[in-house]
């Protein structure tokens, strides 16, 4: 109830054990709700060590003027290459590339996952207009916007970075400051989306 009062987007809240688990659950939830499998990541974001999040773009060898997507490569060995086709990546704060990617892949995306302040990349921050554009494009293409606030939640502001940016995501993940050392994390979001966690819907739990 306290989280819901502080974060307007947190209409319903569920708990997990770690930030990684929260993001895994958020992505699974988005796929279950939309019926789509692909997803969009912002290059440089860290969302935990699970297979779906362990991809990066080879931007150094990529020509942004081409019609081709940047090459997607895994963080390391042990990640099934069959998952590669589901992950799409865009550079942070490149509004044109974001729009182009949605035009090309938007109707197959379940979610866009963004860490607005990238904790593992020297705190590179998303511009407000970039995140607001992401919100608009997600609405236009029926894609769920997931804001990863595992590190920023209740640290940068009472309502998280989303409150500062003035953007309301469909799903949010919190950890770190939520537990202050205890193993706890949060998946929160729109009520209609969150109710997809149900028997016969998306699975959620843990030990």
Role assignments for model-derived ranges:
Residues 1-207:
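Conserved N-terminal phosphate-binding loop of PLP-dependent enzymes in the Aspartate aminotransferase
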């Amino acid at each position: 109830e306290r989280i819901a009062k502080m974060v307007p987007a947190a209409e319903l809240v569920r708990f997990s054990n770690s930030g990684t688990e929260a993001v895994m659950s958020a992505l699974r939830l988005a796929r279950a709700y939309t019926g789509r499998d692909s997803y969009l990541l912002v290059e440089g974001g860290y969302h935990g060590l699970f297979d779906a999040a362990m991809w990066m773009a080879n931007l150094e060898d990529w020509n942004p003027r081409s019609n081709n997507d940047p090459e997607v490569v895994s963080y390391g060995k042990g990640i099934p290459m069959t998952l590669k086709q589901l992950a799409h990546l865009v550079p942070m704060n490149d509004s044109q590339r974001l729009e182009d990617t949605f035009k090309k892949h938007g109707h197959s995306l379940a979610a866009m996952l963004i860490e607005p302040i990238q904790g593992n990349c020297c705190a590179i921050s998303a511009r407000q207009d970039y995140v607001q554009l992401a919100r608009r494009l997600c609405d236009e293409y029926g894609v769920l916007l997931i804001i990863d606030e595992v590190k920023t939640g209740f640290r940068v502001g009472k309502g998280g970075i989303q409150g500062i940016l003035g953007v309301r995501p469909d799903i949010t993940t919190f950890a770190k400051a939520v537990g202050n050392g205890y193993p706890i994390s949060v998946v929160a979001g729109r009520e209609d989306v969150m109710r997809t966690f149900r028997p016969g819907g998306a699975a959620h739990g843990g030990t």
